[in-house]
């Protein structure tokens, strides 16, 4: 089962990150699932592993290779690609070109919260 849902659009953007990974101003949405948010996330060239939240995102710019540990699937994503992540899954991101995406997600519950 592919987690790459399709390609929505292509866009030219003039934007540069200041840190290796970054998430900007989450906007929490009333009337939806508690804790649901929309924000922008990005990463510079490099590789890292992480645990996902329930999320759907659209790549705005850049290119990355994402390997999903649960399924063993590896996809290459770029501008306009729409991807679904499942809470608790682990994956490895290999950012090929600085990437930025807009995400609709439910943040994971922090222990002790």
What is each residue range found by the language model?
Residues 1-40:
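A short, N-terminal "cap"/entry segment at the start of jelly-roll beta-barrel domains
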Residues 33-52, 87:
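Conserved short histidine dyad/triad with adjacent acidic residue
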Residues 51-66:
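Short, conserved beta-strand element in jelly-roll/cupin
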Residues 56, 72-74, 100, 108:
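Short, surface-exposed beta-strand-loop junctions and turns on beta-sheet-rich folds
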Residues 56, 80-81, 91:
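Hydrophobic/aromatic beta-strand elements that line small-molecule binding cavities or substrate pockets
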Residues 67-69, 94:
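A generic structural motif
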Residues 71-87:
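Short acidic-glycine-tyrosine-enriched beta hairpin
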Residues 87-111:
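Ligand-binding loop in jelly-roll beta-barrel domains
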């Amino acid at each position: 089962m592919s987690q790459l849902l399709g390609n929505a659009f292509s866009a030219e953007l003039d934007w540069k990150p200041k840190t290796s990974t970054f998430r900007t101003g989450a906007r929490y949405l009333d009337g939806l699932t508690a804790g649901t948010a929309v924000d922008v996330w990005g990463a510079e060239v490099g590789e890292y592993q992480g645990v996902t939240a329930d999320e759907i995102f659209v790549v705005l710019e850049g290119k990355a290779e994402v390997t999903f540990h649960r399924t063993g699937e590896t996809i290459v994503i770029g501008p306009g690609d729409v991807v679904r992540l499942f809470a608790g899954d682990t994956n490895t991101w290999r950012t090929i070109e600085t990437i930025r995406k807009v995400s609709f997600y439910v943040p994971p519950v922090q222990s002790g919260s």
